[in-house]
Amino acid sequence: MKKIISILFVLCLCMAASAQQHMKFMGIPLDGTVDSFALKLKAKGVTYDAAQSKAAGPGVRVFNGRFMAEDAIIRVAYIPKNKMVFSAVVELQYPTVESAHIPFLNLTESLQKKYPNTTPEENLGPDGDVIGLAFNIPDETGDNSIGFILQALKPSSSGHGVSIFLTYTDMDNFLKCEAIVNEDL
């Protein structure tokens, strides 16, 4: 009996050690279905924007809420086939580049404090210009990446002013998404 209990204990330890760690957005793991993720956002006071979600198309749901004490637009990306969440983008809008400068620097500093084991790298836009920073987020051991955060300053989605975009992506679910999309090839 002791041998069986010992074996079960070792198996439980192995399962716990191999449990996948996921990237988090607003304290919510970027994992599970979009419906489950939406409920967790709702519990944080975030509201669903049906009109913007419909305009965004399949694989994206749009929400409005607060992020770092500011009004924000939150877009959650998921795989339409199985509704698995893999990314969340927060947009903070400002009237001018100058008005976004200090918040951008403050966000950079906050990310560096929260993730001290990562060094931000330049985030390049499609034309090769630097538009922000990229943070590769390691797991607890520091051996593997659980995801990445892209911080960018770009024209606002509203067409007025500029926005700081923070894109949180879970590496494991992003790779699953790519595999599912590539099944169509």
Where do the model's predicted regions map?
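Short N-terminal signal/transit or membrane-insertion segments
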Residues: I4, Q20-Q21, N82-V85
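Non-cytosolic coordination micro-motifs
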Residues: Q20-A56, L92-L185
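Mid-chain, structured segments of secreted extracytoplasmic proteins
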Residues: R61-L107
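Sterically constrained small-residue positions within well-ordered secondary structures
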Residues: V10, F67, I79-K81, L124-P126, ...
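N-terminal cationic amphipathic segment used for targeting or macromolecule association
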Residues: C14-A17, F86-A88
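Sec-dependent N-terminal signal peptides
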Residues: I4-M15
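Short acidic-hydrophobic surface loop/beta-edge motif
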Residues: F9, F63-F67, F135-I137
